[in-house]
Amino acid sequence: MMRWLGYVIGCFAAGVVALNLYFFAAIASWQVFNPASSAFMRAERMRLCGANLVTCGIDHRWVPYDQISRNLKRAVIASEDADFVSHSGWEVDAMLDAWEKNKRRGHVVAGGSTITQQLAKNLFLSGERHYLRKGEELVITWMLEFWLDKERILEIYLNSVEWGEGVFGAEAAAQHYFKRPASQLTVGQAARLAAALPAPKCFDKKRYCANVHISFTRKATVIANRMGSATLPD
């Protein structure tokens, strides 16, 4: 029995190591190549389309970093991760606050996630909230910070984050909401998109707002006022 248990544990450990080696190699390749999609994109496409993947899809259009408005970069940093350029992928104080909140609730309800942590989750992981997934998120976060500079991390984030139902990335979002390229977003438009990030489906379609109470207009105003102090990595 113990030998069988040891075999199972060994196989599981080998699988974890192999998976992380794949993540490590994939992220290293993104110094040169752009990721075609993310785990979250693929899951959403399956949710929206089911088996009809030939004629159904998501709106995702990759654009280079310099073709994304500086207004949007500042708005996202001001909203999601004010210390993005200075931390090493995670912020201990925010994670400790999230830990205390989770202990009070008895399960994972908050993650204290930086932009890099959000990117790690979206690229490779499921949307489930549990401590094992959070641990893997931290490992992938380290990999992203090891291989990629801050500008590249922000570029991939802005091109892969969800901004509505089936809408992914800055270019698709700019066209979807404002009928203009991401390079031409104004301060107000950028602030509105950044305000949508915690609940992008709700921002896009009211039917997703049943259990969400967010004043997107008020939040966008706050973000716009903070954009001037946001530090960009370029």
UniProtKB/Swiss-Prot annotation:
Share an example GO biological-process annotation for this protein: peptidoglycan biosynthetic process
Q: How does it sit in the membrane?
A: Single-pass membrane protein
The family database entries (NCBIfam families) matched by this protein are listed as: mono_pep_trsgly
Q: Give the transmembrane region(s).
A: 8-28
Q: Which Gene3D superfamilies would you find in this protein's record?
A: Biosynthetic peptidoglycan transglycosylase-like (1.10.3810.10)
Described function? Peptidoglycan polymerase that catalyzes glycan chain elongation from lipid-linked precursors.
- EC assignment: the record states 2.4.99.28
Q: Which family does it belong to?
A: Belongs to the glycosyltransferase 51 family.
Which EC main class describes this enzyme?
Answer: transferase
Its gene is mtgA
The UniProt entry, under HAMAP family, shows: PGT_MtgA (MF_00766)
Pfam family of the protein (one): Transgly
- According to its UniProt record, which reaction does this protein catalyse? [GlcNAc-(1->4)-Mur2Ac(oyl-L-Ala-gamma-D-Glu-L-Lys-D-Ala-D-Ala)](n)-di-trans,octa-cis-undecaprenyl diphosphate + beta-D-GlcNAc-(1->4)-Mur2Ac(oyl-L-Ala-gamma-D-Glu-L-Lys-D-Ala-D-Ala)-di-trans,octa-cis-undecaprenyl diphosphate = [GlcNAc-(1->4)-Mur2Ac(oyl-L-Ala-gamma-D-Glu-L-Lys-D-Ala-D-Ala)](n+1)-di-trans,octa-cis-undecaprenyl diphosphate + di-trans,octa-cis-undecaprenyl diphosphate + H(+)
A single GO cellular-component term from the record reads: peptidoglycan-based cell wall
Organism of derivation: Ralstonia nicotianae (strain ATCC BAA-1114 / GMI1000) (Ralstonia solanacearum)
Protein name per the record: Biosynthetic peptidoglycan transglycosylase
